[in-house]
Amino acid sequence: MHKLAHTSFGIVGMFVNTCMVAKYVIINWEMFSMKKVNNDTVFGILQLETLLGDINSIFSEIESEYKMSREEILILLTLWQKGSMTLKEMDRFVEVKPYKRTRTYNNLVELEWIYKERPVDDERTVIIHFNEKLQQEKVELLNFISDAIASRATAMQNSLNAIIAV
């Protein structure tokens, strides 16, 4: 009987040890999984900065080539998409700091991308129009922007996928 008790205790002991090992493995797996999730989450969130850097580099490349700021590019793109509008209406689409507003629009006029019009009945209102004479330059600018985006497409897509996975 002593031998049987010892054997039973041995089996129970092995079972207890197996349960303890299993619990240890589960706890460590949960910690590993949590750590992996945390690392993936942190990596994904950090990709916001990477993606923003890629976007900023596109605008820097455009600025260098075309001598236009981000706001000026966005104003042109908005005009091309929405058509002529007042400065006040444009403010809803493109945020330009008040201290840069006049200089931003005047630069686009100097570069001949846009022209301003004041309605006869309201001298306070200014309407901006795209200069249709620059249609070819518009196509070239859009191609330049498209190429700048395409050259970073894989990196930006990888960043975006990591962000979305968060």
Curated annotation (Swiss-Prot):
Belongs to the rot family. GO terms for biological process: response to stress. PANTHER family: HTH-TYPE TRANSCRIPTIONAL REGULATOR MHQR, TRANSCRIPTIONAL REGULATOR, MARR FAMILY. One of its GO terms (molecular function) is DNA-binding transcription factor activity. InterPro entries: HTH_MarR-typ (IPR000835), MarR/SlyA-like (IPR039422), Rot (IPR016998), SarA/Rot_dom (IPR010166), Transc_reg_Sar_Rot_HTH (IPR055166), WH-like_DNA-bd_sf (IPR036388), WH_DNA-bd_sf (IPR036390). This is HTH-type transcriptional regulator rot. Residues 87-110 bind DNA. Global regulator with both positive and negative effects that mediates modulation of several genes involved in virulence. Also, modulates the expression of genes not previously implicated in pathogenesis. Pfam families: Staph_reg_Sar_Rot (PF22381). Keywords: Activator, DNA-binding, Repressor, Transcription, Transcription regulation, Virulence.
